[in-house]
């Protein structure tokens, strides 16, 4: 009999402890600054859409611009016989410096970043990438379409354009 009472008292104490843990505490610290979904740090460009640029990473490519200021750098080998491409992600278009050399867009990068609703920036794309962009009704800023309105080369070589926001 005494054992049953001890078990009941133990169960009641356990229930009280568990229910006390569910009660709302004091006032929580209200964070006014939202976190950047790319880095987790304080958001510097609230309400602006992230932008991502695919740049060439081949051994013979020209100097790469803008890598140091990117929030996220993705590297992936989309084709077996080519060098991996780099995808530089920035919190907004206004946060981007001159970036390049811009190269062929890869659907792998756009699939990875689709949850962030990034603005894709590329120089042409293959059939799979075009189908992905068309299916999700995404419009990439393409150097082959916009030309010198958004891109510069600094010389006559249009094969490796630089993204320029100024």
Briefly describe each language-model feature range:
Residues 23-26:
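Bacterial signal peptide processing site
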Residues 2-13:
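Bacterial N-terminal signal peptides that target proteins for export
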Residues 18-21:
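C-terminal motif of bacterial Sec signal peptides marking the signal peptidase cleavage site
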Residues 29-74, 79-166:
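A surface/extracellular/periplasmic glyco- and lipid-processing/surface-interacting theme
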């Amino acid at each position: 009999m005494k054992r049953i009472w001890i078990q009941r008292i133990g169960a009641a104490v356990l229930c009280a402890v568990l229910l006390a843990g569910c009660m709302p505490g004091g006032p929580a610290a209200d964070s006014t600054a939202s976190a950047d979904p790319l880095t987790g740090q304080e958001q510097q460009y609230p309400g602006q859409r992230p932008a991502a640029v695919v740049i060439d990473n081949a051994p013979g490519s020209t100097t790469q611009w803008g890598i140091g200021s990117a929030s996220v750098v993705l590297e992936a080998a989309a084709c077996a016989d080519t060098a991996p491409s780099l995808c530089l992600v920035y919190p907004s278009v206004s946060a981007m410096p001159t970036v390049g050399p811009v190269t062929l867009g890869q659907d792998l990068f756009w699939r990875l970043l689709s949850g962030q609703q990034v603005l894709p920036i590329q120089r042409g794309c293959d059939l799979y990438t075009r189908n992905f962009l068309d299916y999700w009704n995404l419009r990439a800023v393409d150097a082959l379409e916009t030309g010198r309105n958004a891109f510069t080369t600094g010389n006559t070589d249009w094969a490796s354009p630089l993204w320029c926001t100024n």
